[in-house]
Amino acid sequence: MLSPAIITLPWRPDAAEHYFAPLSALPWAMLLHSGFADHPHNRFDILVAAPRATLLTRGEQTWVDDGETAFVSAEDPLQLLQQQLDRQPFTPQPHDDLPFLGGALGLFGYDLGRRFERLPAHAQADIALPDMAVGIYDWALIVDHQRQQISLLSYDDPQQRLQWLQAQSRPAMKPFALTSAWQSNMSRQQYGEKFRQVQAYLHSGDCYQVNLAQRFQARYVGDEWQAFRQLNTANRAPFSAFIRLEEGAILSLSPERFIQLRQGEIQTRPIKGTLPRLDSPQEDARQAEKLANSPKDRAENLMIVDLMRNDIGRVAVPGSVRVPELFVVEPFPAVHHLVSTITARLPATLHASDLLRAAFPGGSITGAPKVRAMEIIDELEPQRRNAWCGSIGYLSYCGNMDTSITIRTLTAWQGQLYCSAGGGIVADSEENAEYQETFDKVNRILHQLEN
């Protein structure tokens, strides 16, 4: 039962940024950040780099490289990931104050879902980033904001890893700047046509809810890490992340947990229902109350709660699925969100990867029924979603998992920055309001990068 050696470093609240900055241009350097959020899920920042092994999935193929051997496989990517975890000699016991004890950490793009469900291929695959990019790490730096403690854990010598961290230096990079205006992949008129097509499907009983998105794109130069730091400070999202890939980067400012697994206990917190924040405290409080009591938003939320109960029920202990919180309003800097919580137990015979596969991609960003909604998304959205609406997170050696839904997430690739926003459309949705909601969700992010 190999457990990591742990050393404690002097406290500084910006430790994650401080230690990550010199690594931020290194492929496979990844940071899960709690976004300085005033939020119950803001406790930990997790930093990793220099993985023992890597897994990259593109379409039907996964490239696995463990430093000694490299091979390509058409097997289920999450099965390959589980095999890599099982091959490592590390079996630490879960630790309340250290959520990640080494293991798998990375990106599970929306289109990884094509490996688990049969979907059409209408939408253009125009961003050549992987569907899955996950490293297996035998060390991590964990910043605990609650206990004000910084732990460096390693299955090797943590002092040596600390020296390595301190020896890293950043290559000089140009300051970040947009070099063009943001442009959508659809006009207002095209959005309206797609909205009406969704309505036709809804009224024919084909589905109950479809998440329809538009994608914004701009050219940029310079350092994506600098852009992330600016956005992270301003947006304070509890499931933020910066992922440096071999070609490109993911900048995530997500408010949404996908699935957490802690010592066999499952929790998922789907967001469905959004209204913009208002400047006046009194009006803002009324806005929150309006969202809490909105029959349309509650109906949308309930559909996704039912879908997630069903997805998790595929692998959970029979009879263990519960809904302890329904329709709770959570405020974020730009918007109020309506959130529900679903819990269950995972049988000891199954792994975190089985749970992830059963529920992937998250129902809150597809619609219901899920597979039909995904087919409609592929038909109506011009391009594949790629990293957006997938998941970022970890599967720890100790069996724990925590993942986000990658909404409010930017993809940087070949000098282009992409940012999508959508909303769940139901039978009584109003076209102008749905169109405006896509802007409410990302306007703040888009404008911050223009300045």
For each predicted feature, which ranges?
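Extended alpha-helical targeting/anchoring segments
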Residues: 1-451
